[in-house]
């Protein structure tokens, strides 16, 4: 048994608080257990140089952690003058996940900036960031549509992420920091609400794993992502086949 009597195949308690930031076009606070991330989406009426004149938008992400989001204080990367490799990896993952579920040709020549700021870290910060980023992004795009700046909400599906690992020879879902630190194998799965995979990162930490173990981790993660998609869907009325997404008045959802 794990902390708080959590089962091996059980997600941590998840909570999403929408409109957490009063300024951003879309925002939320997402919590996975003790991990807390503020996600915002901001709209810029411009695109990167490689997209100018192509009548296509872009979505990109930045990720950071507050100095005391962890057990000991870390220097801000802005102070060190260098963005770390882990930060680059995570923010690119967030951006790819968002772009996977939207038709960028239908949002005009504008950029949606996703900012994910970890205020407390206890494992799974990248997965929580992706789950929250989707809510922030979708709300921002719905706002564009409501303002008649675009004529549809071209989002195909929800997208979420979860971690799975092998800890002390046991398969575990949604690892906290202690579990992740002791994992022999660690996997991060990014997938849409209908189970189509966007990205899988799987690696052995000074260990190897079998194809059977890989498939077991993948199955466990994909099954849990159905629950996460259901949580995200609480916030919307949607018919993706006709590019229709509307906000419900829901401000908070829990799992």
From Swiss-Prot:
What reaction gets catalysed by this protein? tRNA(n+1) + phosphate = tRNA(n) + a ribonucleoside 5'-diphosphate
Q: What InterPro entries does its record include? A: ExoRNase_PH_dom1, ExoRNase_PH_dom2, ExoRNase_PH_dom2_sf, PNPase/RNase_PH_dom_sf, Ribosomal_Su5_D2-typ_SF, RNase_PH, RNase_PH_bac-type, RNase_PH_CS
In short, the EC number is: 2.7.7.56
| Gene Ontology biological-process entries | rRNA catabolic process; rRNA processing; tRNA processing
Which Gene3D superfamilies does the entry link to? GHMP Kinase, N-terminal domain
Please give the superkingdom of this protein's source: Bacteria
Keyword field? Nucleotidyltransferase, RNA-binding, rRNA processing, Transferase, tRNA processing, tRNA-binding
Molecular function in Gene Ontology: 3'-5'-RNA exonuclease activity; tRNA binding; tRNA nucleotidyltransferase activity
Query: Which SUPFAM superfamilies would you find in this protein's record?
Result: Ribonuclease PH domain 2-like, Ribosomal protein S5 domain 2-like
Question: For binding phosphate, which residues are annotated in this chain's numbering?
Answer: 86, 124-126
What does the subunit section of this Swiss-Prot or TrEMBL entry state? Answer: Homohexameric ring arranged as a trimer of dimers.
**Family, as annotated:** Belongs to the RNase PH family.
Protein role: Phosphorolytic 3'-5' exoribonuclease that plays an important role in tRNA 3'-end maturation. Removes nucleotide residues following the 3'-CCA terminus of tRNAs; can also add nucleotides to the ends of RNA molecules by using nucleoside diphosphates as substrates, but this may not be physiologically important. Probably plays a role in initiation of 16S rRNA degradation (leading to ribosome degradation) during starvation.
What name does this protein carry? Ribonuclease PH
Instruction: List the lineage, top down.
Output: Bacteria, Pseudomonadati, Aquificota, Aquificia, Aquificales
């Amino acid at each position: 048994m794990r902390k708080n009597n959590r089962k091996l195949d059980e997600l941590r308690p998840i909570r999403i608080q929408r409109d957490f930031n009063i300024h951003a076009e879309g925002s939320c606070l997402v919590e996975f257990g003790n991990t807390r991330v503020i996600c915002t989406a901001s709209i810029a009426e411009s695109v990167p140089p490689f997209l100018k004149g192509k009548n296509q938008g872009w979505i990109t992400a930045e990720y950071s952690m507050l100095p005391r989001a962890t057990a000991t204080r870390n220097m801000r990367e802005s102070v060190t003058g260098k963005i770390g490799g882990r930060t680059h990896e995570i923010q690119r993952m967030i951006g790819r996940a968002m772009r996977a579920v939207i038709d960028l040709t239908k949002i005009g020549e504008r950029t949606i900036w996703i900012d994910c700021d970890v205020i407390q870290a206890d494992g799974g910060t990248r997965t929580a960031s992706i789950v929250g980023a989707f809510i922030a992004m979708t709300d921002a795009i719905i706002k564009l549509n409501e303002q008649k700046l675009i004529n549809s909400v071209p989002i195909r599906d929800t997208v979420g992420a979860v971690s799975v690992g092998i800890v002390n020879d046991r398969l575990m879902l949604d690892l906290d920091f202690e579990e992740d630190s002791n994992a022999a194998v660690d996997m991060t799965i990014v997938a849409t609400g209908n189970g189509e995979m966007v990205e899988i990162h799987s690696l052995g930490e000074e260990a190897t794993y079998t194809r059977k173990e890989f498939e077991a981790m993948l199955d466990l993660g994909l099954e849990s992502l159905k629950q996460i998609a259901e949580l995200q869907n609480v916030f919307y009325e949607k018919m993706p086949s006709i590019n229709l997404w509307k906000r419900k008045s829901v401000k908070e959802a829990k799992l």
